[in-house]
Amino acid sequence: MSIVLRLLSVLKHQQNKMQLDLSVNSYKLLDYSMEWSSDSVVLPPTSSDKTVMMPAKATSSRKRHRKPKLQYAKRRFSPVNPNDLVLVQQEPTHCVRLVFPLSKRWIHFDGLVYSLARLNVSMTVDYHVTLALIYAPEAGECFGNFLHLCPLLKDCLLEFKKLCVLGKTLTILASEWPFFTDVKKNKDNLTVPKAVEWLKEHGYEIYNSQLPLHMSLAKLHDLPQAQFAEAAGLCHYFDPREFALPCALEVVKIGGGKVNGRSIPLARFPINNEFKFIPYLYQCV
């Protein structure tokens, strides 16, 4: 009888142990991404053959499997708009300009000269038209090839009209005379754009000042605000008109020295004009 009781006790103990193993395995089979933490406690069976289990706290152990080539996550960037791009230009170092004969008499500027003298402003004595501003920082820059540009500028008759203030400089706008094709059939009134294109083709970096073709007449930088407004108002009272043929092409260093108010050219190339200025052009004024 005692043997039977002992066998029953052993069987019951093994049955309780099997139930314990099944309960643990059932928790493991719920989710492979869940594991037991240190907070889960399983009490061994007591002498009374009862098993007590405490609730287990699950923590995530999911790992991200990344490919070696995708070590860094991809980032999304907003598209770039054209307005977001800023083109940085180098400051110009030299000025390529057209100059006129010293004997040229600007008779239609006489009234303007007298009015500016009342404001203690002197007209410039270095009349020129800026053809292009270029960036050439090399100290030994050679401008000898500009000699081949002069034939293109031959017989380029310029018309000056309409006063305006650009920045704080009194200027007059310049353009090729549109009626010159009737006199010279080989002209197309596109000399200035072709000359600028010639500079680009020969490797010169052109600085875009976004200013129209003009000729500076007087500097108004030192005037008080009231006198500056009065000088700027002269543009509405005077409407001079002049014609001139450039006699030479000059290269001047920006900020270079001057003699008697005239910039010292680094290079000067004469323009051999065939067309002679004729008096009847004044009848168009």
Curated annotation (Swiss-Prot):
Alphabetical list of CDD domains matching this protein: ORF4b_HKU4-CoV
Primary localisation category: host cell
InterPro entries, per the entry: ORF4b_HKU4-CoV
GO CC terms in record: host cell cytoplasm; host cell nucleolus; host cell nucleus
Protein name as it appears in the record: Non-structural protein ORF4b
Gene behind the chain: ORF4b
Gene Ontology biological process terms from the UniProt entry: symbiont-mediated suppression of host cytoplasmic pattern recognition receptor signaling pathway via inhibition of IKBKE activity; symbiont-mediated suppression of host type I interferon-mediated signaling pathway
Subcellular location: Host nucleus; Host nucleus, Host nucleolus; Host cytoplasm
Keyword line: Host cytoplasm, Host nucleus, Host-virus interaction, Inhibition of host IKBKE by virus, Inhibition of host innate immune response by virus, Inhibition of host RLR pathway by virus, Viral immunoevasion
